[in-house]
């Protein structure tokens, strides 16, 4: 989220076709898996029957956000000429700064799993040990294949590059 907001912010400096295509390609690269990853992350906390209502909240919120940002865009387009920038440049800059703030906040607030909610600056996690066991058991009863989720490992830059360049995907 942070990477795509930085690239999107750079869109306010686009000057031609090549910069447009470069920005859009990088946006697609960084933003492409966001929804799928968000659904996967939410599935760590909710059973399949609970997940559908949470995802409906996500999609409704997305639609409402698009309505609100359209109204904001109308006002921002009237900023044309300020600082030597066009209205569309201001729009990219302002909207993406909000995305950057949300991305940085998400980095600090989102946790890897139900049992890993403690942060260095917080002595308590989100749940008590009993609540963690209840949630984990509920998730495993709903989908036993999630029992091997704990074998995750960090991704190196080499592994990332192999994934990007694998043309069999």
From Swiss-Prot:
Xref: SUPFAM superfamilies: MFS general substrate transporter (SSF103473)
Keyword match Transmembrane: yes
Membership in a protein family: Belongs to the major facilitator superfamily. Allantoate permease family.
Keywords per UniProt: Membrane, Transmembrane, Transmembrane helix, Transport
GO cellular component: membrane
Gene3D superfamilies: MFS general substrate transporter like domains (1.20.1250.20)
Membrane topology: Multi-pass membrane protein
Name of protein: Putative uncharacterized transporter YOL163W
Cellular localisation: Membrane
Record flagged with keyword Acyltransferase: no
InterPro entries linked: MFS_trans_sf (IPR036259)
Transmembrane annotation, as ranges: 25-45, 57-77, 91-111
GO MF, any single term: transmembrane transporter activity
Species of provenance: Saccharomyces cerevisiae (strain ATCC 204508 / S288c)
GO process annotations (BP): transmembrane transport
Domain of life: Eukaryota
């Amino acid at each position: 989220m942070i990477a795509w907001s930085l690239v999107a912010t750079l869109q306010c400096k686009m000057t031609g076709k090549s910069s447009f295509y470069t920005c859009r390609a990088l946006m697609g690269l960084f933003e492409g898996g966001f929804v799928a990853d968000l659904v996967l992350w939410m599935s760590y906390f909710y059973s399949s029957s609970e997940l559908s209502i949470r995802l409906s909240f996500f999609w409704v919120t997305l639609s409402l956000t698009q309505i609100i940002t359209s109204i904001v865009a109308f006002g921002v387009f009237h900023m044309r000429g300020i600082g030597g920038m066009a209205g569309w440049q201001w729009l990219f800059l302002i909207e993406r700064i909000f995305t950057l703030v949300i991305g940085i906040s998400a980095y600090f607030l989102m946790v890897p799993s139900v049992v890993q909610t403690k942060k260095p600056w917080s002595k308590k996690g989100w749940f008590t040990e009993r609540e963690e066991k209840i949630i984990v058991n509920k998730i495993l009863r709903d989908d036993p294949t999630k029992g091997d989720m704990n074998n995750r490992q960090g991704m190196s830059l080499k592994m990332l590059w192999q994934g990007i360049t694998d043309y069999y995907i």
